[in-house]
Amino acid sequence: MWRGIGALLLMLLLLSSNVCAQTDTLLYPLKNVPLLSGNFGELRATHLHTGLDFKTGGREGLPVICVKDGVVARVKVSATGYGNALYLEHEGGITTVYGHLSRFVPRIAKVVRNIQYNKESFEVDENMSGYELRFRAGDTIAYSGNTGSSGGPHLHFEVRDTKSEHALNPLQFLSVKDQTGPNVRGVYVYSVSDEGTRTPVRRVEVKNTGNRVFRGGKVGVPAGMVGIGIQSDDYMKDSWNKLGVYGLSVRANGQEVFKMTMNELSFDQTFLVNELKDFHHYRENRLVYLTFGNYLGQLLPVRNQNGGFVSVEKDSVVDVAVDLSDINGNCSRIMFQLWGKSPLRELVLADGEKLLMNHQSDSLKKEKYTLWLEADALPYPVVCKPEVSSRLRDSVETIEVFSTGKQIYPGTGFCVDH
């Protein structure tokens, strides 16, 4: 009997400690409660954002705070990337990162200066485990700045899993006041054939019926595979900056076909941002999340069935429900129907267009330039039409490869310098 009670108490103790570890709250890295200009998982031009960007009011030199008792594990000084950056390890298996700093506190700055002299190098990327530079929660460790690849003064802050080095959503560890769900800006449907070709993207008109529920009507689509795109963004209290969506799910006739929860990212996957966003809309400053695509299954925050596609048979109707949420659980919902009509017509290429199959190696030729593509370089078949433009003032010719509106994904561009 006592053995059973002891085992029960041990189990409760372990469960209790595990809950504490998962709900460990950190201090904010700036005094008071700073405003966000960028959040975790946000769609950037070339990558998914792996941290939070805190506003500093256009100023440099604000004290940066140690968010939890820890030790300096790494220091980096660079003209690019995070610029002057600190990495602190903490109990509980997490590492915090502070980027674009203007300077370090004297205890750290003295060590960094000695390393620079010894290596005869301004740029430093040093393991600091032997220096035992420990700080308590609330201590000032550095000052905010604009170093590295920064577009203006701000603090970039990350939380990482120390063992896997995956980036974790810092808002899981910070107390956030937010009472408004994500905004719904638009809904798009992409009808896809077996080859990967599609009809021009169709926008679904939806109306806010109250309580953040948006309803659309019955949308006629070619029978076959249909992908859903959601134009959405989020805001936090007292900030005008558009932020990325935390949670997004799609259900077809009650069955979940896509689910995204931005809690964790692997750095070797952040380049897949162009599989998660509609690039054509992004160029027009619209954030449209694509909830379909075979490559999406590689992203840690994403889970999908059948590539996230909705199967619509001829003369059938499919009920679609889309749920969006922020990390505080504030939600918005979209509901509409897809009605299957005639299948897609056979693809016809216009002059100058070429169909690139994703599973085959191929090449594009235009004037004196050739672009070679390896097999699987593209997520889906793409119809492209390369064009060459010249800028005489800097002797640069640019080859831009555009999709023609007949395919799922846009092409890419590359430059050739003379």
Language-model segments: residues:
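Surface-exposed, glycine-biased beta-strand/turn segments
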Residues: 20-95, 102-107, 122-131, 136-137, ...
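Surface-exposed, short loops/turns at beta-strand junctions within beta-sandwich domains
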Residues: 311-317
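Short beta-strand elements
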Residues: 328-352
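Exoplasmic/lumenal beta-rich domain surfaces
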Residues: 95-130, 197, 207-217, 244, ...
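Proteolytic processing hotspots in large secreted/extracellular or virion-associated proteins
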Residues: 346, 387-418
